[in-house]
Amino acid sequence: MLQPKRTKFRKVMKGRNRGLAQRGSKVSFGTIGLQATGRGRITARQIEAARRAMTRHIKRGGKIWIRVFPDKPITNKPLEVRMGKGKGSVEYWVAQIQPGKMLYEMEGVSEDVAREAFRLAAAKLPVSTRVVTRTVM
């Protein structure tokens, strides 16, 4: 699963997920991409599950780029523990997703195969998505 090798701080505050994706919103590496249209948090497990679904569908053809990385730790206190006594321990890692963020990119397969692979991947993700192609200027 994806997670940072080391971080400056072990735990972070919750924060707010507002605004639109300023960076990473265009197809940069492949020819077709899966772009988020909604906002939310994607866990490392969900990123991996979507990657596996795509990889199984394209069957060794083409290349996949993962454009998101889970760099935010989410903490959780154990069950039946009273409030207080500090922040809980880190349970999993998430990537915060804003509308417009490119999640995955692909090349080397036909467009209909790529669209079907992205459809399978989108079913594993908690944010709404759309398929976009690279615009040639």
Swiss-Prot record:
Keyword terms of this UniProt record: Ribonucleoprotein, Ribosomal protein, RNA-binding, rRNA-binding, tRNA-binding
Entries under Pfam families matching the protein: Ribosomal_L16 (PF00252)
RNA-binding is among the record's keywords: yes
Record GO terms (molecular function): rRNA binding; structural constituent of ribosome; tRNA binding
Protein's UniProt keywords contain Signal: no
Disulfide bonds: none
GO biological process: translation
Domain of life where this protein originates: Bacteria
One cellular component term from this protein's GO annotations in UniProt: cytosolic large ribosomal subunit
UniProt xrefs under CDD domains: Ribosomal_L16_L10e
Family: Belongs to the universal ribosomal protein uL16 family.
Job description of the protein: Binds 23S rRNA and is also seen to make contacts with the A and possibly P site tRNAs.
Oligomer and partners: Part of the 50S ribosomal subunit.
Protein name as catalogued: Large ribosomal subunit protein uL16
Species annotation: Alcanivorax borkumensis (strain ATCC 700651 / DSM 11573 / NCIMB 13689 / SK2)
Organism lineage string: Bacteria, Pseudomonadati, Pseudomonadota, Gammaproteobacteria, Oceanospirillales
Gene encoding the protein: rplP
